[in-house]
């Protein structure tokens, strides 16, 4: 792909088409661009378009496409081809900073993101001059350029907030601080001075305050891991200026917009974050500045309005107070009763009120409301911050705080009782205040795990929550209904079971509520209750206890999916899945109707998949339907195949990537349900499963391997007779998988199934080549994971084909190789094998080598007999060796490249653990004793002599125990 005008024209046309709303035009254009992105110069063509195109829409589109291209392809994944040639990488890094800084802001942001993606992989080792190039631009005096540098630096350095400490991180941050801290501080001071100079110039102030926000964010990132010496030495400069900015009020920077935070609010919010960071992590060094910041932030809180634009500022300011009041040596600032009352009255209660903006979100933007309220993304809301402050104050002042707030709760409930339809917000605030007060520790999985004992949660539930939920009208006071349901969710471990049981039909009833929030909360509450565990770790609620409600529960759950705004509601689908799981055979009478509804839903959502969690829970529900029904009646599998195969065919033909791994897992489950041979409908699919294109997607691999294993388990004879020409393709898949460090274990799963199930004569001609491939991989890239899998495989091979066959195949590849494998791999590494079935396979295989392999008794291999026995006793008795060499620690932790669909394991499609030696050997220790006894009868005197002279005392003692347990002796 040359950088010619003609070549620029083609991507321009296709980029235009990617913006077309018509999928018939848009998708082919997207596919075309994906198909050419592997060509050399492709990324440079996009950058050239950015520079030369006259059409601004094309420029923006090219910048987004370039960023996504970098996101998908820049990372070099081990065992995979480099997707961007080295020349293009060098050219991109040479040009991108200049291009980013000279572009308009909209494009600058995209290129800045691209730089940070490249930087995450290449900086500092492969891009050492990036920092110098950026710092030099500070001298330009052009704040468009300076802000571009700051924005890029922010996206590059913000990962320091989340990284674990390591030598590599320390080296990188030191390099960054040495190059960046002083120029950043000088820029900070210069920008503050310019703000004074241009105090009456609104447009100049807007640019300067944008810079100050980015500088403050960078301060946070650079100080997050440790307090750098430079910033400790310059704390006076930073903190004095931060304090000045916190108390600054410039009319020119105030906005009329009530929703969107202005620059002044954003800057003050970030400064509150910075002060909280220092108060929490560097309190000793920060101590002398703290009282000034507490005063400034308190004044800020009592003078800031209730408008939405101040939400982030107020929540960060409250979070600052929350972080301070939790520290033991600041508690004197809060211990006065008047101070606590004042905080409650002026900060906490006002910020717990349900505002008009919250009501609007509840009604019109329910998805976002639920995300914030249920999923904990409410980190920057006033209510969440106020709740955290209550918890912080309760750490040292639980009694006084509970007393003060109880008074507020009672007066709010009295106000509500006077006129519920007008004063319902008072009750909402009261419930929230009780929740904040009572919640000491909380997790998503278990709700409240530690509660304030001064609050009677059950009494509040009976008096103030149940009456709202018992009301006949599920659509009345929707916010209070949602509050009540959430109360059940949060305090499900504190409210007694009998009260929760009373709640279940009420929650089922609220699945019919028109409010998306209410019926979503009802579904979520039911799902959480159904997962609760009792004292014996069984589910707290039994199927028998829920039996009276089965029909109405299933009816209302599926009806809820038809309510406006909830057609792909993940909480409802998760509740369906959980109900199936809890109720088991009680759902069988309803399955014919429900599987039709699930199939129709699957067909609809597969046209345009947009809700991954919904899709996952739906697939789980389908698996549960199959499992539960076919457990009672295996012949019913045919009905499921009739219902599902048409939709599956459409998904596979349309290459719906999001659903293909699910389809393969469900098909595996269906196929495994067949007890006899493989139906012809499956065999027709078999050749297609071996197509290389399917195996190129990482997300498909585990599901495809599982499906091929099901084919091998159920139909190995059919494959050997009717599809023998496909065996090389099957082994080709194994060869591809074994070459990858990320997927080699999947290759072994497949190989083990081939060895275990295929008729020996069908794979005879390929056996030697299989071993050669494995040895090549061992030679080129030996990892702990590979060795463990290799050990299981050779022992399974030994069990299947015999110990002599294993010795002969090794020595057939290279003379004396069998001895090398024993000495260098089996004996020293067997301790690393994990998993009960895997250990059992290895134990039975090694027992065969010891007792059924003549060369082990009368050749040069005899010297390895006792060390091999010693290693087997070690496998039985010693702890597993789970040490991993340093260089391998991150070998399996690979991000899924780019936008490929990651594999999502379906729990209810799960394969039962298969034990290939289960029928042959029950107890491998007894089996070893019996096999040694048998060997000793064939060669009297030799085995006791070898054992007593070479086995260490501890191992010998264990062995004598096995012999006694088996009631045998060595002759």
Curated annotation (Swiss-Prot):
One Gene Ontology molecular-function label: small GTPase binding
Alphabetical GO biological process terms: protein export from nucleus; protein import into nucleus
Main localization (coarse): cytoplasm
Subcellular location: Cytoplasm; Nucleus
Domain Importin N-terminal: 29-102
Keyword ATP-binding: no
InterPro entries xrefs: ARM-like, ARM-type_fold, Importin-beta_N, XPO2_C, XPO2_central
A Pfam short name: CAS_CSE1
GO cellular component: cytosol; nuclear envelope
Signal peptide: none
Family statement: Belongs to the XPO2/CSE1 family.
Protein name: Exportin-2
């Amino acid at each position: 792909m040359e950088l010619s005008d003609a070549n620029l024209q083609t991507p321009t046309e296709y980029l235009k088409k990617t913006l077309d709303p018509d999928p018939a035009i848009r998708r082919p254009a997207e596919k075309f661009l994906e198909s050419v992105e592997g060509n050399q110069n492709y990324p440079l063509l996009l950058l050239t378009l950015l520079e030369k195109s006259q059409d601004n829409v094309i420029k923006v589109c090219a910048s987004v496409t370039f960023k996504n291209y970098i996101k998908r392809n820049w990372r070099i994944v081990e065992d995979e081809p480099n997707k961007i040639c080295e020349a293009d990488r060098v050219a991109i890094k040479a040009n991108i900073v200049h291009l980013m800084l000279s572009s308009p802001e909209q494009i600058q942001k995209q290129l800045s993101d691209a730089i940070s993606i490249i930087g995450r992989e290449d900086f500092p080792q492969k891009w050492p001059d990036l920092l110098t190039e950026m710092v030099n631009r500070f001298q330009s005096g052009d704040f468009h350029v300076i802000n571009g540098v700051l924005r890029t630096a922010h996206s590059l350095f913000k990962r320091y907030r989340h990284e674990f400490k390591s030598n590599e991180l320390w080296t990188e941050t030191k390099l960054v601080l040495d190059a960046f801290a002083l120029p950043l501080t000088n820029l900070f001071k210069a920008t503050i001075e310019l703000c004074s100079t241009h105090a009456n110039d609104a447009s100049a102030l807007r640019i300067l305050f944008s810079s100050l926000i980015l500088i403050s964010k960078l301060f946070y990132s650079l100080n997050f891991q440790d307090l750098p010496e430079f910033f400790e030495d310059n704390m006076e400069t930073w903190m004095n200026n931060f304090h000045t900015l916190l108390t600054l009020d410039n009319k020119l920077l105030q906005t009329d917009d009530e929703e969107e935070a202005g620059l002044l609010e954003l800057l003050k919010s970030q400064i509150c974050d910075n002060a909280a960071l220092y108060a929490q992590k560097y309190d000793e060094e920060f101590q002398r500045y703290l009282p000034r910041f507490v005063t400034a932030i308190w004044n800020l809180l009592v003078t800031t309005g209730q408008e939405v634009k101040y939400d982030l500022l107020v929540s960060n300011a409250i979070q600052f107070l929350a972080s301070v009041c939790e520290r033991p040596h600041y508690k004197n600032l809060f211990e006065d009763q008047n101070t606590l009352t004042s905080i409650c009255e002026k900060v906490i209660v006002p910020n717990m009120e349900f505002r008009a903006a919250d009501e609007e979100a509840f009604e019109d933007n329910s998805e976002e409301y639920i995300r914030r309220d249920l999923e904990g993304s409410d980190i920057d809301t006033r209510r969440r911050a106020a709740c955290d402050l209550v918890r912080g104050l309760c750490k040292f002042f639980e009694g006084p705080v509970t007393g003060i707030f109880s008074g507020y709760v009672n007066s709010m409930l009295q106000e509500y009782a006077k006129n519920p339809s007008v004063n319902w917000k008072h009750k909402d605030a009261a419930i929230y205040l009780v929740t904040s007060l009572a919640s000491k520790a909380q997790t998503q999985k278990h709700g409240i795990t530690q509660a304030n004992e001064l609050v009677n949660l059950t009494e509040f539930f009976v008096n103030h929550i149940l009456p709202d939920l018992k009301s006949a009208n599920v659509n009345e006071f929707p916010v209070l209904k949602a509050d009540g349901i959430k109360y059940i969710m949060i305090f499900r471990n504190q409210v007694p079971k009998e009260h929760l049981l009373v709640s279940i039909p009420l929650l089922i009833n609220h699945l019919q509520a028109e409010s998306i929030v209410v019926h979503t909360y009802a579904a979520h509450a039911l799902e959480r209750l159904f997962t609760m565990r009792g004292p014996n770790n069984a589910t707290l609620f039994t199927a028998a206890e829920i039996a009276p409600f089965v029909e109405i529960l299933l009816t209302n759950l599926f009806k809820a999916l038809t309510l406006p705004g909830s057609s792909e509601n993940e909480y409802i689908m998760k509740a369906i899945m959980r109900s199936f799981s809890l109720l088991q055979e009680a759902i069988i009478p309803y399955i014919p109707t429900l599987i039709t509804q699930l199939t129709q839903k699957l067909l609809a959502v597969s046209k345009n998949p947009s809700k991954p969690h919904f899709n996952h829970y739906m697939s789980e529900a389908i698996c549960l339907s199959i499992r539960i029904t076919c457990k009672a009646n295996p012949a019913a599998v045919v009905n499921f195949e009739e219902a599902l195969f048409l939709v599956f065919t459409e998904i596979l033909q349309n290459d719906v990537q999001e659903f293909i791994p699910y389809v393969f897992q469900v098909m595996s489950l269906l196929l495994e349900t067949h007890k006899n041979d493989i139906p012809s409908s499956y065999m027709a699919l078999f050749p297609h499963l071996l197509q290389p294109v399917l195996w190129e997607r990482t997300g498909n691999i585990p599901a495809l391997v599982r499906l091929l294993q099901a084919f091998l388990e159920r139909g190995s004879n059919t494959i050997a007779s009717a599809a023998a020409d496909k065996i090389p393709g099957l082994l080709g898949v194994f060869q591809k998988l074994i070459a990858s460090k990320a997927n080699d274990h999947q290759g072994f799963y497949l190989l083990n199934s081939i060895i275990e199930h295929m008729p020996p004569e069908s794979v005879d001609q390929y056996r030697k080549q299989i071993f050669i491939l494995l040895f090549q991989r061992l030679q080129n890239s030996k990892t702990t994971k590979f060795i463990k899998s290799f050990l299981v495989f050779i022992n399974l091979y030994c069990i299947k084909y015999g110990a002599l066959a294993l010795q002969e195949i090794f020595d057939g590849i290279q003379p004396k190789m069998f001895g090398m494998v024993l000495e260098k791999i089996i004996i020293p590494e067997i301790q690393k094998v994990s998993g009960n079935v895997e250990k059992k396979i290895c134990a039975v295989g090694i027992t065969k080598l010891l007792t059924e392999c003549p060369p082990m008794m009368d050749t040069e291999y005899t010297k390895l007999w006792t060390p091999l026995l010693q290693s087997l006793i070690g496998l039985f008795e010693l702890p597993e060796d789970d040490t991993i060499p340093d260089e391998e620690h991150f070998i399996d932790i690979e991000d899924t490249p780019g936008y490929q669909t990651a594999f999502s394991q379906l729990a209810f499609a799960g394969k039962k653990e298969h034990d290939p030696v289960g029928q042959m050997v029950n107890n491998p220790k007894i089996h070893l004793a019996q096999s040694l006894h048998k060997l000793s009868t064939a060669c009297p005197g030799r085995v006791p002599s070898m054992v007593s002279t070479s086995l260490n005392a501890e191992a010998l003692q264990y062995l004598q125990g096995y012999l006694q347990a088996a009631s045998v002796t060595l002759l």
